Amino acid sequence: MKLVIVESPAKAKTINKYLGDEFKVIASFGHIRDLPSKKGSVLPDKNFAMEYDISDKASKYVDAIVKYARKAEAVYLATDPDREGESISWHVAEVIKEKNKVESDDFFKRVAFNEITKKAIIHAVENPRKLDTNLVNAQQARRALDYLVGFTLSPLLWRKLPGCKSAGRVQSVALRLICDREDEIERFKAEEYWDISLKMQNSNNELFTAKLTHVNDQKLKKFSIINEKEAKDLTRKLKLQKFYVEKIEKKQQKRQPQPPFITSSLQQEAARKLGFSAKKTMQIAQKLYEGVDIGKETIGLITYMRTDGVTLSNDAIADIRKLIDKNYGNKYLPINPRIYQSKVKNAQEAHEAIRPTNITYTPDNLKQKLEKDYYKLYELIWQRTIACQMENVIMDLVIANLASENKEYLAKANGSIIAFDGFYKVYRESLDDEDEEDNKMLPPLKAQEHIKTKEVIPNKHFTEPPPRYSEASLVKKLEELGIGRPSTYASILSVLQDRKYVTLEKKRFIPEELGRLVTVFLVGFFKKYVEYDFTAGLENELDEIAAGKLEWKTSLNNFWSGFNNNIESVNEQKITEIINYLQKALDYHLFGENKESKVCPSCKTGQLSLKLGKFGAFLACSNYPECTFKKSIVSGNDNNEDEGNLSTILNDNKILGTDKDGVEIYLKTGPYGPYIQLGEQCGKVKPKRTPVPTNLKQSEITLEVALKLLSLPLKIGIHKDSGEEIIIGYSKFGPYIKYMCKFISVPKKYDFLNLNLDDAIKLIENNKAKLEKKHRSMV
């Protein structure tokens, strides 16, 4: 038996039917090993050793893989053809080697394919290769970088900015883009400007519109007419003028089709045309790639969907051209096939573009066989693929230059018409911020023809701020900057929303206050690591590792030495210094240009300043506790929700850190006082909670103290005489020792969290002596 291992059951089902009975196809269900979410999973001091664990979820799949591998004559690793897929295959091979004592690498065959079709699968199985260690190392380097940033920067954030959940190597840079754009919008000052339109009529009484372009031989610029008075003066003068056609220009314009889809362009176009999120687009594309049921069979309908290559195979181009000729006619078919070059920064071109695996499966053929959203995305991919090999669109353009009889004023009218629809026959690309007017034809005009001016219209405009990022435009910007890779865009956008750092309103990203705080903090104290060029440079290094041009641990060492020094430096910063910096950096956002807006509206003498608390960021008066005014700056929290004791709000819901499993530990305040909580409530399952001892101040509750409290009740040893367990615990009556079903109070003079066995036995014996003395006195 030959064992074939893929990532998903759907992919396994599709591949299984193409291979004979000698093959057994099973799924790993994604990654079987990963770095556990705890300290020490990557060890810089040990040459970046990485401690991988098999998750509880993956263990049953690993058992099946190991069992079948014992019976197999060879293992075919058929995971996705990218770094992530190579990494999954490597982990599978490593686990099989360890569990089954396999020593030879020849036992493993790496098979890679760009599409799940019978031809591609058979060819891959017949032509296996060895695992590409360069690709594996590139993925390990990326994972290590993300871990080192997350598990050193996030805890620092929890200490310095209570309420902030995490920071990531790439997500923080994407967040900065969104926040920087919001800063531009807030600081933007609209400027007034005017232009003049003229409604004209030709000799056949046909109307058209022209725009004033020159006055006294001076070309009008955007701000040539800056107020209503100037516009009205010009309007009055133009009404007295007679115009004629000075010159007619005619020319043709050709529009070329866009390249076939890559990951980013598919996400952008699906967002514009279909309203799909990047996450939804990738989920559907994954299913279309792995295989869907179309009635008589399950087939993979598209090629691999994580790619930055725009090339198409020669066979695919031949099939596309054949279909164009058959369905649309020879005039829509260029003489030569179109060959595209990627414009993506650092594109790898390792895979084909995203295309249908069989171009003869037209959308019409599949409309009744696919789910609605699956059909929409497949149709988009099919149309773009066909269009990319079709003829140009040809536009006939007409430009009429008009002049006043005294030559003092010039105007221009434009018109266009589609002379040949070319690839428009199948597909038209959308624009993210479309501002093009509909194409209009001009009526017939002749040179020297006199034109009547029917109306002169002054048009008032204001400059507009840059638009907020949509999913499509943010992905495009990340791609232009060389930040992230095709496989990461969707997850970056999802994480920012899941962390409540940004919201998506009317399909545009708006940063939340927490998101802005994190960004300002990182720009202030970790500026290098959220610079666009630096992050893109790391992506370049990962590409060099994948190409075998750079040793991966050298790259990690170069990054870590500087980053760790930065962490240690910021750790020494006082929280007051950080708050002061945040206050200064966010001053314009919070108060604008009006200094009076900083004055406390309650006491009239204090100054408002930034604070962080239970409900996010808010403003509080500097005269606290004499003045308890506060105002939430988080959307939706200007209500009684944040009323209460200000000192409580400042310390409530503080994240202390995480336990060994990566679960967050909170310091909270309830109706009965402060308490420690492990994790969030999940449905009806309440998280573990323990009260804070009354002799401890909230400022004394560190992560170490919280972990000790959560570990209670805890066995601290065995009594040397009786052999019975001694347990330390804490209840509403205070700390206690439990011994032989008896509860013994721990006096305040003892640090009960660090109580040793000898002291515990001493307390037990003292309690025993007291009881015996009491008993004798009663007798």
UniProtKB/Swiss-Prot annotation:
Name of the gene: topA
Protein name as it appears in the record: DNA topoisomerase 1
InterPro entries given in the database record: Topo_IA, Topo_IA_2, Topo_IA_AS, Topo_IA_cen, Topo_IA_cen_sub1, Topo_IA_cen_sub2, Topo_IA_cen_sub3, Topo_IA_core_domain
Sorted UniProt keywords: DNA-binding, Isomerase, Magnesium, Metal-binding, Topoisomerase, Zinc, Zinc-finger
Site (Interaction with DNA) location in chain: 31, 142-143, 146, 158, 306, 499
Family indicated by similarity: Belongs to the type IA topoisomerase family.
Cofactor(s) the record lists: Mg(2+)
Single GO cellular component term: chromosome
Function: Releases the supercoiling and torsional tension of DNA, which is introduced during the DNA replication and transcription, by transiently cleaving and rejoining one strand of the DNA duplex. Introduces a single-strand break via transesterification at a target site in duplex DNA. The scissile phosphodiester is attacked by the catalytic tyrosine of the enzyme, resulting in the formation of a DNA-(5'-phosphotyrosyl)-enzyme intermediate and the expulsion of a 3'-OH DNA strand. The free DNA strand then undergoes passage around the unbroken strand, thus removing DNA supercoils.
Residue ranges, annotated region (Interaction with DNA): 166-171
GO molecular function: DNA binding; DNA topoisomerase type I (single strand cut, ATP-independent) activity; zinc ion binding
Residue ranges constituting the Toprim domain according to the UniProt record: 1-111
Signal sequence, renumbered to the chain: none
PROSITE patterns in alphabetical order: TOPO_IA_1 (PS00396), TOPO_IA_2 (PS52039), TOPRIM (PS50880)
Record note on quaternary structure: Monomer.
Zinc keyword on record: yes
UniProt xrefs under CDD domains: TOP1Ac, TOPRIM_TopoIA_TopoI
EC number: 5.6.2.1
Binding of Mg(2+), residues: 7, 80
Taxonomic superkingdom: Bacteria
Zinc finger (C4-type): 600-627
Catalytic-site annotation from UniProt: 304 (o-(5'-phospho-dna)-tyrosine intermediate)
Residues annotated as domain Topo IA-type catalytic: 132-568
Catalysed reactions listed for this entry: ATP-independent breakage of single-stranded DNA, followed by passage and rejoining
GO biological process: DNA topological change
